[in-house]
Amino acid sequence: MEQVLFIVWRESVEALLVVGILYTWLRATPEGKRGLNYLWGGVAAGLALAVALALVLLGVSSWLSDEGQEWFQAIMSLAACALVVQMVVWMKKHGRTLKGELESGARSSVANDNWWGLFVLVAIAVAREGSETVVFLYGTVSAGEGGGDMAKLALAGVAGFAVALLTFWLLQLGGKMITWRRFFRVTEILLLLLAGSLLVGGLDHLISLDVLPTIIDPVWDSSWLLSDSTGVGKVLADFAGYRALPALISVLLWVAYWIVVWALLRWVGGKPARAPVPARNAS
């Protein structure tokens, strides 16, 4: 539940940032006001693409055999893990220039009187965030022990979007307590922890399919100290991949994951930004 709320919240804020930047720029430009209908049309098209992806995933899952579903869930969990890491790296690389890049695309549409270009730009941006949300949510559910109560999952998603609207409003105020930089820094850490959890969940599926050797199973037993099924241990299991009875292969690959993440972030952090543009000035 907490994972669903967090994922919807984080991705919705990012989508609102993109739409907010373009909306503000179009409203401030006399010629740009004609593009507002294309902006909202792009938002609708992007959401439709994300919903279509969700229906495809549900459809594929429904006609698979038990073993096929195990494979599909393993693949989706690992794909979601990779997508989270890619997203964090991309935002770290483009975050400070995102506003300028979006406005440049909008400016080009105005100059060429090509509003369909703006439509496509927005549709791709929203579809990207929506598709990431769909894959993350499916991967999160797949990495767990079951789909859970769909009504509760839907409620968590609605709550996540509501909190995203509030968060976006607070961030747009430009206060010192909550800034775009601090928001992305904190949520990047949480996303990477969640990606580690998705990795471990995917590995659990592969181990159950006898694809991966456990080497030693379990390598330790910490259930007497912290169970991974209740309380704090359950939260750590959901958000960081904690296991009270882990297989050695899972531990080794989890450590390898963090080494790769550290190397990627170090590589991206060492590359100079082209033109820093504070995102909080989007409106």
For the regions a protein language model found, what residue spans apply to each?
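Multi-pass alpha-helical transmembrane bundle typical of ion/small-solute transporters
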Residues: M1-S283
